[in-house]
């Protein structure tokens, strides 16, 4: 296996040359590649329709638990101060209160329709984050609906518990912060930042249908929360110092201000997601984009089959994360390789995200892997346009592949293993 372990050395060399400026450039490239500006616009429109239903459902859940009933007003205040710029939250809070009061008077059928609207927002978020993580297979729809309905019902309780804990911590810490100038104010400003960081990190960790490293999720969540707070201050400064919208729209200025704020907020959420997703693939970007490594996927597929073949002998199951670590590949690269192998019936996913090889290595030739990942002449014969010379060339290439790559994987990896040392004679 020495032949295949050496291929990771160029990758390890590249990992040492990570520069923050290059990483931010990579993040911005991915941000626009995933059309995050258009997705933020779609989420803004869906949020406008879903915000009141989500608030109504959340408050009804809170009302069902007397222990958190006293936090109902504080939850609304927390949502407004977090989601709405200070210059506009007074007017919007009045409208939100009226909408929530009207929604509370609806029947069970009416609330169910509101729930559908709220779930539509969550499904849109689900698709957006999975697209950023380049996930090709989403969770089953019923599974996703159950998860997000649980979030709608349990989320308000968690917010209430967080506010209760925050209130207790602030009361308990006054003895420590009393002697620190501005200590209480600093604690008040840090609490929303911490709660927002936790919310973003949990979303980046749970929503993508992929195993996300918790360090990457936290990094993206903290970055998004810090950017969110900075943007909130900047937006409030712009609205108060440059009242362009008030001058143009008059009393209706709250509407475009709120829409613009929602759009910028979703841009920040998506940027944090791109940062979290980029951390897993950035280390291997230069090696993967090397023009001299266009056949690298074929070589990586051989290495992956070698690992699964050894696991098959030992009766073990390899997870996607262990494959990434052993091959030093990004999650996207491993997933693309496994998808093609599943279609070729080389491997299969078992319970709990494990992967096993279902075809005997003696039955898989190197030519089979080459045709799957590099070049399949038979598939291009119809594009020759009837040119007999090109058709003959493709036939010759196919014959050459079969002749030069007829070795089965069982013999390839056996021959690659180092021979045991000879015994010393007495």
Curated annotation (Swiss-Prot):
It is a multi-pass membrane protein. This is UPF0761 membrane protein Nmul_A0452. GO terms for cellular component: plasma membrane. It comes from Nitrosospira multiformis (strain ATCC 25196 / NCIMB 11849 / C 71). Keywords: Cell inner membrane, Cell membrane, Membrane, Transmembrane, Transmembrane helix. It is found in: Cell inner membrane. The chain crosses the membrane at residues 48-68, 106-126, 145-165, 187-207, 217-237, 255-275. Belongs to the UPF0761 family. Pfam families: Virul_fac_BrkB (PF03631). HAMAP family: UPF0761. NCBIfam families: yihY_not_rbn.
